[in-house]
Amino acid sequence: MGARASVLSGGKLDKWEKIQLRPGGKKKYRLKHLVWASRELERFALNPNLLETVEGCRQIIRQLQPSLQTGSEELRSLFNTVATLYWVHQSIQVRDTKEALDKLEEEQNRTQQKTQQGKADKGVSQNYPIVQNLQGQMVHQALSPRTLNAWVKVIEEKAFSPEVIPMFSALSEGATPQDLNTMLNTVGGHQAAMQMLKDTINEEAAEWDRMHPVQAGPIPPGQIREPRGSDIAGTTSTLQEQITWMTSNPPIPVGEIYKRWIILGLNKIVRMYSPVSILDIRQGPKEPFRDYVDRFFRVLRAEQATQEVKNWMTETLLVQNANPDCRTILKALGSGATLEEMMTACQGVGGPGHKARVLAEAMSQVTNSAVMMQRGNFKGQRRIIKCFNCGKEGHLARNCRAPRKKGCWKCGKEGHQMKDCSERQANFFREVLASQQREARKFSSEQTRANSPTSRELWVRGEDNPLSETGNERSGTGSSFNFPQITLWQRPVVTVKVGGQLREALLDTGADDTVLEEINLPGKWKPKMIGGIGGFIKVRQYDQVCMEICGQKAIGTVLVGPTPVNIIGRNMLTQIGCTLNFPISPIETVPVKLKPGMDGPKVKQWPLTEEKIKALVEICTEMEKEGKISKIGPENPYNTPVFAIKKKDSTKWIKLVDFRELNKRTPDFWEVQLGIPHPAGLKKKKSVTVLDVGDAYFSVPLDKDFRKYTAFTIPSINNETPGIRYQYNVLPQGWKGSPAIFQCSMTKILEPFRRKNPDMVLYQYMDDLYVGSDLEIGQHRAKIEELREHLLRWGFTTPDKKHQKEPPFLWMGYELHPDKWTVQPIQLPDKDSWTVNDIQKLVGKLNWASQIFPGIKVKQLCKLLRGVKALTDIVPLTAEAELELAENREILKEPVHGVYYDPSKDLIAEIQKQGHGQWTYQIYQEPYKNLKTGKYARIRSAHTNDVKQLTEVVQKVAMESIVIWGKTPKFRLPIQKETWGTWWTEYWQATWIPEWEFVNTPPLVKLWYQLETEPIVGAETFYVDGAANRETKQGKAGYVTDKGRQKVISITETTNQKTELQAIHLALQDSGSEVNIVTDSQYALGIIQAQPDKSESELVNQIIEQLIKKDRVYLSWVPAHKGIGGNEQVDKLVSSGIRKVLFLDGIDKAQEEHEKYHNNWRAMASDFNLPPVVAKEIVASCDKCQLKGEAIHGQVDCSPGIWQLDCTHLEGKIILVAVHVASGYIEAEVIPAETGQETAYFILKLAGRWPVRVIHTDNGSNFTSAVVKAACWWADIKQEFGIPYNPQSQGVVESMNKELKKIIGQVREQAEHLKTAVQMAVFIHNFKRKGGIGGYSAGERIIDIIATDIQTKELQKQITKIQNFRVYYRDSREPIWKGPAKLLWKGEGAVVIQNSEIKVVPRRKAKIIRDYGKQMAGDDCVAGRQDED
């Protein structure tokens, strides 16, 4: 203790002991706090000696601060202690902890800019898990639970969509291989995806080992070893080795390398989930441009290409693959157009409507010019017209081709078009007032955001006003102007000055004009009649009258007449910036826009019954009074259907709006909260309160610019009157953005209260609030009232009927007591007959109960739901399901409670096996006091064992613990250390093993048999194999032993995989207690090496039984068809009569030819009758053919006469390549110069050898030259220019260039000159590599295509000729000739004809005549007199 107490001494210790723990509190810091902090630092793996210096405290603060958000109360206390000590070391006086934290925050804010600049200079990310400690050593900082939780949520929500890759890249910034494996382990449940990822990692690791061979000899002292592929993957390297490699000089970035491998694998997985190619994305003739863009970018994200290539694809393919209408517009915009400009320009383009508009525009221009010719002799020079839309002269707005300008062309306001504008024509002050209105509108919206009151009020701009109010919470956020506020609890009557006379007048925002009682005003007036509620009255109209309202001056029209009350109308109120403010939360609105290029919903309202219309009118009238909705006019073109339903067991109606269409057009919102809070994560508190926010969504304002899209209409019966139109001012129920915006807004509102009361725990989920504290009940309730007042100031009410003050508290489906919690009471129904829906609800209730009731099982009940059943189908309960339900009823009879979390104690998770693949677990801190319980019964693969299932349970519990408590528990597992260790050493995800201990809770988990790692000396060796015929389903399985024994059995209705397993079962049956088995089946090896103890396959279960009986078993794999002794013998044995076996006969010749030509495996399999696996093995064993992948071809125009030409460069020389698009056939030559003359000569040679109709080239100077154009003209060749990767472009030749260079690389050493190697490569490509359509080589394919083309043309001629004939025919024994029918085909014995249907008529009953263009009439023998063909 002495060493730890030496952190402070002398005067500093005195200063320390004068600092208060809390502002105004009695308790102060003591020496014991330093001792406690030293011990805590050791728990967090930090050096306690750091507390002795300023720099050391700064280091601790940097380490602890990022974890405060998810950390425990102990962590926060430690941080507060170190922060206070930091200022004592600097001899800076602080009174209490809060002041120390405030000063620390100020200092960090001052240095933030400097720190950011330092980061930019270094160019190094500060998010690395490897950090430098005080001693200068590089240490590892594990990934935070928050990061792992975010990664898990991404996979759960996005599956393996393209967004997963950038998210993984961001979350794993600077991670070590161990960190990356931890991330993979947390999503290890996706086995198919993980297997693909594993295969990719293994391939890349093998490639790394091949490219980085091990250095011979021992490693010199002081030098670290080079990492192998498995080291980079984190399976054979320690964390310290990884850190050493990553921080050495020069560094070996094993983390980044491994991350690159994982991203390669993720790309493959994404490809599997998103198999569409970017080349396939084309805009349909009538498809809206915005939908096409959505599809394009969705597929683009999945493309495996660099960002530069993706940018290029966006610039070119997006335009090229648009439909002709949109493409014309996009090309007119130019190459620099943004996506938003494209969307705007193409809005509404496409389909018959667009074509009609274009035609109308053309017709109107023709008509106008004709009219001008007729009127040319009358008036003088024609007035120049100007477009409202683009501002240019010479055309009208309706004929304008520019993108339509937003808003009305008359008044400039948005939300309606000029034809719907309600502005009156005779508005002499329109331009002046419009500018003032715009200013007032802008001004008032800013003020509304900052200082909107909590009751309905009228605001008027003013300089001085004693009525101005500002709340404490909002002080400092308002505008620099002072706005008077006039509440509407009484009539808003103010004193105004008109023409120097004072009058009391009502501020009426619903009146258009200002009307006063008899008052003498100077100036001229004119009579006018105005309509009011009581009828029409005669008034005098005075123009340009000056009026002063609340210190503001306005000039406008005043009407004087017998009005019952003086009214100041909108013509004056708008000039002084008067606004009407509703009781909506004054928080800043979240800006929302529609998806780019989309417009709002325009869905018609469907008919409603009379009672529903009355209910909706009543509901909406009340909502309008409360300011939640506003009436709108016909200028709003949008609409969403509305309807009403009755509450369950009630006569009250509920209004529902069908926002599905608006939701489609609204961008996605990121859910602020990733899940619901769990009571097991709550800390025990002395006082607790549960609140509910009333009308939660309706208390948060909706973005003003977005409100128009929420419009809806209440119809009338029999269309008696126009529908009543409304739009929402607040967040609507059913709109996709409401939950996220509400959560975000509520978090901002609660932030000041949280800051002010850090010792109070406040859980917020939607409109449910849980508040806990360690205060006495009186103080606690005072704080609750303070919270309620705080919420009320922001417009949120907390109804008394949902204000829970006394336990038990009902919260989020749970029942909370002061020192325990449970789920709310669960009653299981007792039914004679169960429907599918009943069982689904029952399983849901049991799953909910399982989080606190241990031992709940649902496996047998879930089995009842297998298959596709209707919800109302009756399902009989099986005996097992009835037993399971009865056991669950017994469990639920006894009430069970969970306790609350204590951060000072460790978490312990205990797992038990229940049998039949079901598991249960409890998480606790003290024995018999569970925090929560759970169950697991998911079987992820057909063949599994208990150890594998146990690891899945451990994974689930660990993930659950990270989410609820932010840390993993210590596990107590029913398995021996040796069994667990044996399994994990073989299991591929052995990178993260949780802390655990053995607990002897029967039944224990064990491995029922163990496979040997080395052959058993002295044991008999069985070579096993199986074969099956795919067509007949007949098969054989057997074995051959090293002692001369052999056995073969015949099997029916089987497959190759089953026969391989049957052969292993046969060997196990006929062998002794020790046996060596050799198979060539990876399938069978994979199943048995996983050591399953149960399987869905009966055959695998039989093999497991045999394995358990054996003392020792060794299982090995050898490749098939390689001439390996016993394997070859047994293969011939089981293949007899089943399949044709060709072994070594052609292998030598194939290998010899491959060394010369490096032909692909398809060509060798075809030419030498080799099995594909053997041919692939020959290619795999060739060191020059280890280039990954083959050229991928997009969809291009594959007409027989189309060729693509391009120049490529190699060894400083130019190779001119021509590719026949349909076949892939290549012609190539090394040319002396990239000139038009050489290119034209090459084209003429090509045309002399093959039929060339069209050539596609790029825009190179040699291809665009006059010489090439002349050659093409002479040879009657059409020349087209394209863009790479685009249909009818250069994609094929670009990929063939790569393929050609690859082949040249393989044969280059066989030729002295490059031109020789080029021709060798052309020969190999055209005749020695097979594949693609028909399995031909390119040379065979081009000949086949040309021959087929000739035959097709000839056949077409015959068809055309045949179609000139008509057929008269007789049916069965009827003597009457029928017809004429159309001749489709003429054979030797019959003809095929088409009349009302297609028929086959014998040749002897048909008369074929030539169609001379006139109808043959009558049923006589006219047909017989015609010439028969």
Swiss-Prot record:
Keyword RNA-binding: yes
Keyword Zinc-finger: yes
Boundaries of every Reverse transcriptase domain copy: 626-816
Regulation: Protease: The viral protease is inhibited by many synthetic protease inhibitors (PIs), such as amprenavir, atazanavir, indinavir, loprinavir, nelfinavir, ritonavir and saquinavir. Use of protease inhibitors in tritherapy regimens permit more ambitious therapeutic strategies. Reverse transcriptase/ribonuclease H: RT can be inhibited either by nucleoside RT inhibitors (NRTIs) or by non nucleoside RT inhibitors (NNRTIs).
Modified-residue entries (Phosphotyrosine), positions: 128
Gene Ontology MF, one: aspartic-type endopeptidase activity
Domain Peptidase A2: 503-572
Pfam families found in the cross-reference section: Gag_p17, Gag_p24_C, IN_DBD_C, Integrase_Zn, RNase_H, rve, RVP, RVT_1
Bias type Polar residues, positions: 110-124, 445-455, 467-479
Record-level GO cellular component terms: host cell; host cell nucleus; host cell plasma membrane; host multivesicular body; membrane; viral nucleocapsid; virion membrane
Stretches the record annotates as Dimerization/Multimerization of capsid protein p24: 273-359
Residues engaged in binding Mg(2+) 3: 1206, 1258, 1294
Active site: 508
Keywords, sorted A to Z: Activation of host caspases by virus, AIDS, Aspartyl protease, Capsid protein, DNA integration, DNA recombination, DNA-binding, DNA-directed DNA polymerase, Endonuclease, Eukaryotic host gene expression shutoff by virus, Eukaryotic host translation shutoff by virus, Host cell membrane, Host cytoplasm, Host endosome, Host gene expression shutoff by virus, Host membrane, Host nucleus, Host-virus interaction, Hydrolase, Lipid-binding, Lipoprotein, Magnesium, Membrane, Metal-binding, Modulation of host cell apoptosis by virus, Multifunctional enzyme, Myristate, Nuclease, Nucleotidyltransferase, Phosphoprotein, Protease, Repeat, RNA-binding, RNA-directed DNA polymerase, Transferase, Viral genome integration, Viral nucleoprotein, Viral penetration into host nucleus, Viral release from host cell, Virion, Virion maturation, Virus entry into host cell, Zinc, Zinc-finger
Annotated motif Nuclear export signal, positions: 16-22
Site entry: Cleavage: 128-129, 359-360, 372-373, 427-428, 435-436, 483-484, 582-583, 1022-1023, 1142-1143
ZnF region ranges: Integrase-type: 1145-1186
Positions annotated to bind Mg(2+) 2: 1025, 1060, 1080, 1131
Note: HIV-1 lineages are divided in three main groups, M (for Major), O (for Outlier), and N (for New, or Non-M, Non-O). The vast majority of strains found worldwide belong to the group M. Group O seems to be endemic to and largely confined to Cameroon and neighboring countries in West Central Africa, where these viruses represent a small minority of HIV-1 strains. The group N is represented by a limited number of isolates from Cameroonian persons. The group M is further subdivided in 9 clades or subtypes (A to D, F to H, J and K). Resistance to inhibitors associated with mutations are observed both in viral protease and in reverse transcriptase. Most of the time, single mutations confer only a modest reduction in drug susceptibility. Combination of several mutations is usually required to develop a high-level drug resistance. These mutations are predominantly found in clade B viruses and not in other genotypes. They are listed in the clade B representative isolate HXB2 (AC P04585).
PANTHER family: ENDOGENOUS RETROVIRUS GROUP K MEMBER POL PROTEIN, RNA-DIRECTED DNA POLYMERASE-RELATED
Annotated protein name in UniProt: Gag-Pol polyprotein
